[in-house]
């Protein structure tokens, strides 16, 4: 038996259409690129968030799809450290809302945004609410 595909980026559009029709949850990892001391890579938040989501979705591949991670978030307080990448909160919110609206437009009625960066938290909350209101 062929395993159920769940990596959104590796699926074909007919597979995505079928996944949405099946009522699967679209899991969206979101983090940022920032410093984590002298010993860890700057994409630590992204790696950890994605790994947690991957592990969870792998347990229920027929119930969820794993969307590619959103790598950039709101991190202006880390800009003193070379390598950090931040985007403005308005840009972050517009981008995330567009991602969520795209998923809804393709038939996903349940979206789980998994946040791997503390400073994204208030914006993720608002994005979740706006997705419900605007779709």
Q: Could you describe each region identified by the protein language model?
A:
Residues 1-37:
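Active-site and ligand/interface coordination hotspots across diverse enzymes
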Residues 56-70:
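Active-site machinery of serine-nucleophile hydrolases
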Residues 24-26, 63-65, 112:
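Structural motif
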Residues 28-36, 68-70, 74-77:
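Short, conserved active-site loops that position catalytic residues or coordinate cofactors/metal ions
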Residues 5-11, 72-135:
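Active-site histidine-anchored catalytic micro-motif
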Residues 20, 57-60, 132:
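Structural signal for hydrophobic packing residues in well-ordered secondary-structure cores
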Residues 19-20, 38-40, 80, 106:
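Soluble secreted/lumenal catalytic domains
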């Amino acid at each position: 038996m062929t395993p159920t595909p769940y990596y959104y980026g590796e699926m074909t559009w007919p597979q995505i259409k079928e996944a949405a029709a099946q009522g699967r949850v679209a899991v969206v990892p979101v983090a940022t690129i920032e410093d984590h001391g002298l010993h860890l890579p700057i994409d630590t938040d992204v790696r950890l968030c994605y790994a947690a989501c991957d592990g969870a979705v792998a347990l229920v591949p027929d119930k969820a799809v794993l969307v590619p991670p959103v790598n950039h978030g709101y991190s202006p307080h880390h800009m003193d450290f070379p390598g950090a990448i931040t985007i403005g909160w308005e840009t972050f919110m517009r981008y995330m809302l567009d991602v969520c609206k795209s998923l809804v437009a393709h038939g996903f009625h349940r979206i789980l945004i998994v946040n791997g960066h503390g400073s994204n938290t208030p914006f993720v909350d608002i994005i979740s609410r706006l997705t419900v209101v605007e779709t």
